[in-house]
Amino acid sequence: MRFQLRSELTRKSTSALIVWFLFGVVVFPGCSTQTTLPADSAAGGQPRQRVEDVPQPAWGIATVSVACARENPGHKSELGTQVLLGHSVRVWKKSGSWYEVETHDGYRAWLELGTFELFSAEAVNRWQHANLAIVTALETVIRERPDGQSDVVSDAVIGCLLERISQEGTSCKVRLPDGRQGYLPASVLEDYADWKKSRRPTTDAIEATARQFLGRPYMWGGNSPKALDCSGFTQQVFFLNGIDLPRNASQQAGCGAPVTLTPDLSHLCKGDLLFFGRPASSRGPARVTHTGIYLGNGNFIHSYDRVHISRLGEPQAGPENQRRRLPIAARRVLPHLP
């Protein structure tokens, strides 16, 4: 049956059940905290626009490969997070062409209309129950025809969600949330429901996934293959292995179980999350400012300048504790490890 979306908002309440697109299948209760951002501050010196509540329930779906959500309405505002194509958001407020949205992990930031579309609760529910496929290649393109030479409809990155229409040879015809259609190699897609069921997070799988991102640039607020900040990197790696983490490093530091840190690192296992920053002292509590994934033998992978592998304790320029890469905490989130 052909799936069709209507871009709309409804002023009526609905009993339709909206199932959030959680970025994985393992969720740690109590980890995710909602970050409510100021909605009525002027961004980057731009003229202040009136902020209005949006009639509820209101939803949206990202319609570009990576939609950039900013801390305040306006292009000059700081990047807060990113939303991948085909993923839904809850919509709360409006300021001009900008909408305050809430992502699956509770993060609130502002998306510009055009990078996402507004949909009713019923339309989002239909999308979530369509024949969805997830992109499994780091980067790919959707073309007008299955020939590899026609014009590009959109790019896509790993984790994007598309509706699968049909397969034609080695190509797959897909539909985007806004109704656009195109083709991409069938080899870069996997049935989303099957993909979620097949996630088996192991230490080797975590390492292999993390290494796919080596060399990708750092960008504050980024959590896509195009560019990632430290916690966006760890969130993506674990999402691709079926584990859902909160957005920020300080929130991730509350997930899983604590791991004792000793000079010989004997308690650490591959796949553990490492946290860096200011340790607790008489001057104040501990403050997490950076995170990475332990690989074993004193090595860890993280996004700083770019995604790369560092060695614990190696000297680096910058503030003492963080740049010497001495962790102040570690957490174990892989469920099968002791």
What do the PLM-derived regions correspond to, one by one?
Residues 218-232, 236-270:
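Catalytic cysteine-centered active-site loop
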Residues 93, 166, 277-278, 304:
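Conserved "cap/hinge" positions at secondary-structure junctions
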Residues 1-12:
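N-terminal secretory signal peptides that target proteins for export/translocation
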Residues 77-80, 153, 200-204, 224-229:
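Soluble non-cytosolic domains of exported or imported proteins
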Residues 39, 47, 148-150, 190, ...:
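Aromatic- and glycine-rich peptidoglycan recognition patches
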Residues 16-30:
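Bacterial N-terminal signal peptides
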Residues 33-57, 87, 95, 102-136, ...:
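Boundary regions of SH3-family modules and the immediately adjacent low-complexity/disordered segments
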Residues 52-55, 62-91, 135-164, 218:
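Beta-loop motif signature
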